[in-house]
């Protein structure tokens, strides 16, 4: 983890995300990646979040 991810994760923690989720979301945002998770409670505007099944259907089928 670098300082940029840590700073963004800290901001997300203030908004209520648990620390592990804040780190994962921050990493996905900063790397412009799709977040693949089974945790349907994770939401962040502008971040594409898919379940593993949705990812397979969208990108691998």
From Swiss-Prot:
UniProt keyword list: Signal
Signal peptide stretch: 1-30
InterPro entries named in the record: PIN-like_dom_sf
Protein name: Uncharacterized protein AF_0063
Annotated organism of origin: Archaeoglobus fulgidus (strain ATCC 49558 / DSM 4304 / JCM 9628 / NBRC 100126 / VC-16)
Organism phylogeny: Archaea, Methanobacteriati, Methanobacteriota, Archaeoglobi, Archaeoglobales
């Amino acid at each position: 983890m670098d300082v940029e991810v840590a700073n963004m994760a800290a901001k997300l923690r203030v908004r209520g995300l648990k620390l592990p989720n804040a780190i994962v979301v921050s990493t996905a945002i900063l790397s412009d990646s799709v977040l693949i998770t089974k945790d349907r409670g994770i939401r962040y505007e502008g971040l594409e979040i898919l379940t593993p099944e949705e990812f397979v259907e969208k990108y691998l089928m």
